[in-house]
């Protein structure tokens, strides 16, 4: 089902959305490729600081595939994995805002950005690293 000779993780957002919606690639395949990429690169880059459990992510991807099979799409981000900066609440993820003081805070609900991305079909995979000086400079 994957696009021949093309690494899924190298597709841009629009091309990935198009491939998912035309069923050239499944949401599960996209998620598996994304998780493999994170597992391969994160030990060196330390970009991902909090991640949703793989089984939960694959179940969400399977649900997105089932929706497409029924002719339903949530929007152009349908099934597209998203890493969100550790600045916006994502329900169930540890949200530190880059501060050691917040290291144990777990969001009980999605913030505006995450809820809009999810409403458009995105699957929130993880938080990306954020340092406190980043927030202070905004």
Q: What annotation goes with each model-predicted range?
A:
Residues 1-60:
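An N-terminal boundary/leader segment
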Residues 15-16, 71, 112-113:
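Residues within well-ordered alpha-helices
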Residues 39-45, 71, 89-95:
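Secretory-pathway/luminal and periplasmic proteins that interact with or process carbohydrate-rich
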Residues 62-64, 89:
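Glycine-rich loop at the start of a catalytic domain that most often binds anionic cofactors/ligands
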Residues 64-80:
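Immediate post-signal peptide segment of exported/extracytoplasmic ligand-binding proteins
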Residues 76-130:
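Short glycine/serine-rich loop/turn segments
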Residues 129-138:
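Single conserved hydrophobic/aromatic residue that forms the stacking wall/gate
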């Amino acid at each position: 089902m994957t696009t021949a000779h093309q690494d899924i993780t190298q597709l841009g957002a629009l091309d990935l959305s198009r491939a998912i919606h035309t069923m050239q690639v499944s949401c599960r395949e996209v998620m598996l490729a994304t998780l493999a990429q994170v597992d391969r690169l994160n030990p060196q880059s330390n970009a991902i600081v909090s991640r949703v459990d793989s089984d939960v992510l694959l179940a969400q991807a399977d649900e997105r595939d089932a929706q497409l099979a029924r002719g339903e799409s949530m929007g152009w981000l349908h099934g597209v994995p998203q890493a969100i900066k550790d600045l916006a609440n994502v329900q169930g993820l540890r949200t530190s805002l880059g501060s050691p003081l917040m290291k144990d805070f777990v969001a009980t609900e999605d913030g505006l950005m995450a809820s809009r991305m999810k409403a458009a079909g995105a699957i929130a995979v993880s938080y990306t690293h954020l340092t406190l000086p980043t927030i202070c400079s905004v």
